[in-house]
Amino acid sequence: MTSSKPKKTSRVRKTTKNSKKNNPVTMPALAKTPPSFKNKVVDKKALKNLVSWAYKTHGTAITAAMADNLKDLGFKYATQAAVSISVDDLKVPDAKQDLIGQAEEQISATEECYRLGEITEVERHTKVIDTWTETNERLVDAVKNNFNQNDPLNSVWMMANSGARGNMSQVRQLVGMRGLMANPQGEIIDLPIRTNFREGLTVTEYVISSYGARKGLVDTALRTADSGYLTRRLVDVAQDVIVREEDCGTERSIVVEAEDGKFGARLLGRLTAEDVLDAEENLLVPQNTAIDPALSGEIEKASINKVKIRSPLTCEANRSVCRRCYGWALAHNHLVDLGEAVGIIAAQSIGEPGTQLTMRTFHTGGVSTAESGVVRSKISGKVEFSSKAKIRGYRTPHGVEAKQAEVDFILKIVPQGNNSGKAQKIEVSSGSLLFVDDGEEINSDITVAQITAGAVKKSVEKATKDVICDLAGQVRYDKVIQPKEVTDRQGNITLKAQRLGRLWVLAGDVYNLPPNARPVISSGKSVDEGTVLAEASQSSEFGGQVRLRESIGDSREVQIVTTSMSLTNFKLIEESTHSGQIYNLESIDGISYRLNISPGSKISNGEVIADLTDERFRTKTGGLVKYAPGLSVKKARSSKNGFEVSQGGTLLWIPQETHEINKDISLLMIEDMKWIEAGTEVVKDIFSQTSGIVTVTQKNDILREITIRNGTFHECDDEEVLNRFTEEGNLVNPGEKILDGVDNKEILFVQKLETPKCRGLLLRTVEEFTIPDQAELPQLAHVKQEKGPYLGLKAIQRLTYKDGELIKSVEGVELLRTHLSIESFDATPQMTIDVESIEDKNDSSINRLNLVILESILVRRDTISDSSHGSTHTELQVNDNQLVKAGDVISTTQILCKEKGLVQLPNVVDDEPIRRLIVERQEDKIKIKISDKALVKVGDRVVDGDPISKSIKSTFCGEIEEVSNSSVTLRYGRPYMVSPDSVLHVKDGDLVLRGDGLALLVFERQKTGDIVQGLPRIEELLEARRPRDAAILCKKSGIVQIKQGNDEESVSLSVIEKDDLVNEYQLLVGKNLMVSDGQQVAGGEPLTDGPLNPHELLDCYFNDLKDQKPLLDAARESISKLQRSMVSEVQNVYKSQGVAIDDKHIEVIVRQMTSKVRIEDAGDTTLLPGELIELRQVEDTNQAMAITGGAPAEFTPVLLGITKASLNTDSFISAASFQETTRVLTEAAIEGKSDWLRGLKENVIIGRLIPAGTGFSGFVEELSSEAGPHPDILAEESGGYRRAQNLRPDYTVDMPQSPAVSSSAILDDPSDEDLETTRNRHGIDPSSSNFAAFARPNAENQFSEDQLPDPAALEGLQEEGLLSDE
């Protein structure tokens, strides 16, 4: 591999150190040209060029002085002129009104086309938006011209035009029009803001405009953070890229292609990879020459379209970039210096403009920008298509019928008759649109075609839009629509239009019928105003007694008492308390129930309506509850409401008074374990209620509780007796012996007690409460109908406390509660029970409680007709208090006709109820008089402008109903255009009201919704994210074969490869094909639309190439292809936002992302499968394998996103300081990694000088002593390794080292056979100078005599500091 030295030309100069600082050299080529006098207005751009030229020509000092002078000049005149903006400076161009008028005319013409059903709703929307966009652009031009011609010294214009402040888009909003705005969903609103800020916005416009303003503010805030993080990741991935070599000597290069014959700045500062020759093979630019603007211009003049240049992408310098491949440092436009940290410069150059990018994602709602590539006829003549022309019908997004070319061909316009002259030739590319037919004669300046740039199929997605009816009437389809029922995977049936056609709505008065109404008139009958069209009746479900209520709102309630129950033997007594009214029920025998409900309320089944207030089960104090055998309760999930008694019995109650004190012990006025009388003061101001023995509970000198237990205390020392009882207590039945001399005639509760002075038993009395099996129910009087729900009361007894529960209380508690709950069977959920208070029949002073189940029927009031309902008349068929049976009619409602006309009923299937009917009125028709023969027949549909007879054209749309010799009757109608595949919501003959949905238009729009722009897109690219819904890529090159499935949705796609292998591709629903049958495709080409997955793209390139080329070449070429596409993708995003970044910066970053490969099979090398390693390293390893005859490693190239690449860098210090510190450091420790401190970051962290700039020279010396890339390769100069660390662990030994090098871990040595095999495999002679690597030391880690090499080699090692003197 030879590297030719750069030929010295006037354009490249080599500078020695410091030459730039001391003597600014004038470049000889430029020195000869005399200074030219430029007499023109200097704006921002010209100023930039001027300063740049001065810097290149005269160096820093002169340029700085000139810039200073320019600043002073500017300030001087700015001060004199005192430029500022006043309202009068904002001059609105006169042409504005005309332009807006023209736009409105175009839009009303579009609306008219829509009204006539010539275009769909989508096409109308697209056309309107495009019209406004175009108007806005024309208005900007008008603003520019107005200022230029009428007021060139206008302050606003000067500022915007010179680039001092502001730009045209801001001026446009100040004096032009604000234009179209997007709504919060990102869709463009088709109502533009026509005014500007000078004229002032209307309220509506202001609100619309504030959407965008808010979005802008939020956007800016988010952008700064995102941009900063992007810069940090970029710096981390590229921080170790430093210019370390003069020339890497590579023969690889990249090709730069001219765009429209121009290279722009893309060649500047790059070195040519080979001689550039012109058309006559003359040498234009020698190899390795830096291209300056003059040379770039010469190359363009010579019409050279491709130039091979050197690039960081193809640089073969190890872990760095060489000067030649990098080219100029753009700071001073000279070849980059050694030691320049180009990685960090690249990272900052890409990250810094991030704040200028937008984050917005636009959903334009199917909007295509202004038509591009429109070709007009230059002459009049006859159109001729060439023989190979293939075209098909196409409808443009604006609804214009055109043709689309399927192949490339030539279209000629041939002059006819007297017009002799040259024919006009137009090259039509496939996908272009044609607006003329073959053989058609046309005039000059007619739009002939719209040419697309090559056969680029745009990525499209399906979107939908509703078609809303704006006229009530009957639906009719055009025959061409051919609706077809389609069943989807879920089994839902939808009706779809197969062809483009019209859906008509014919006018008429549509009546909505109530749910249970049925028509009483047949189809085709004439009706007058007030005729009954339909009747609806309401009937009772259960029957009962009718109550008529006062009307509420626009309906009247009829109540039917189905079941009622009166509590005749209870008085209803009302009490007033401060919290409101309380109602009690009192029986004759004095039992009182507290009502939980009040009259007038509604209750449901099972609800508790009253509680019995029973003093018999109330205690005087707290105590202990015990259930006697026989008493049982139902198990309940929660004990919140108590325990329901399932079987009655005896409840035992042991009284016990408990005072909760929580005061200081000093306040205690009695002694523990002493008997006290009722009324004793136990603590200051607290008195006992009962007599008994006191127990005091205290903690930390705080008095917690005082318990007073009733009963008598008997001293006893008999262990046997005491052991029969516990401190918790035992129940003793009457007659059972306790102690001598104690006669128990009733149940006692006995507890063992130990006082400080003596021991004994406390005998406590037990109270007994008898609980019945069933609670006593009040006597009721209830009604049971023959049909209807039953109503009754049920009493429930609930115990408040569970068995063994201790209630700590001074006041008494309620042990048993009796609840009254309502019980009703056969009641439907919507039937509620009403609570009423009624007077007693015999005594009006007494009120009784009455419970009734009501069936409530709302009867509609009579209504006057409105747009969707006819007038109704409702009649009640029952009287108050009348008894009705189940199924009796309560009311009938009649729907009356509003106007005279002809009734039509819709077609219904089976017994489907009729919900609408239509009356065709006189005003829905028009009679058109004709004098000659009619050209239409009954049933024809005509639109505005269609001929009815030879002399008369229709001025309306509709359907012909009658044709006679003198007149034609037309029924008004409204056509709606529906596109193929639209979903139809209505059937032929259906009746619709205004506002109903007729169809859902399915249309294709360019995928703009998902075109993520700006920063998120840059991030997506640099992080190599896998996009959602990615395109399907061709795995290997071949010929496409497309087969149509049974239903129109399913398409099978396969590619026939070289060896006749057929590769089938699974197509997902909604994916559009980007290829046609029989087309030749290459590996990596997208077969369907959608964003490209970069990882998959790399795999496809690699798999396609590795069958044709050696593994290494395939990897290099596939990586190179991916690199080029990534650089151009990133550039496109920045360019679209008007940000210029030099390619080389992006190339440095992309190089870092694509530098690694994944080992698939290690062969005989010491690499590990799955390991990520640099391609260069693998290349060297495989070369060594080729020499030794071992099996090479197999690998696949990988693409790493910037975050992943940063974490996979060779330096673990750099990776750990970036992200996931613990994981990175742990892994590095386990693997025993070494960090060579190559990058800037590692050195900064450790606190050394960084190996860039002035610190670079020291680093070069260090590098020269450093080991090569991998143990399997022998370094060239010394014939072997000198550092033990660089070796693989399986043959590493400890070895004396110079202090500069850290010692690595000692690992187990392989057995002698292994050692021998390793030596043989690598062709290594044990006596070579890297003997330490492959020799085996003895136990003391010393080498034996025969292991040591000859003294000369030893001396060499000692000199290098690798062996100590011993």
Swiss-Prot record:
- Key word Nucleotidyltransferase present in the record? yes
Cofactor binding annotation: Binds 1 Zn(2+) ion per subunit.
Task: State the GO CC annotations.
Answer: DNA-directed RNA polymerase complex
Reactions the enzyme catalyzes: RNA(n) + a ribonucleoside 5'-triphosphate = RNA(n+1) + diphosphate
Q: Which GO terms describe its molecular function?
A: DNA binding; DNA-directed RNA polymerase activity; zinc ion binding
Basic residues: compositionally biased ranges: 1-20
Which leading EC class covers this enzyme? transferase
Biological process annotations from GO: DNA-templated transcription
Q: What does this protein do?
A: DNA-dependent RNA polymerase catalyzes the transcription of DNA into RNA using the four ribonucleoside triphosphates as substrates.
Report what the protein is called: DNA-directed RNA polymerase subunit beta'
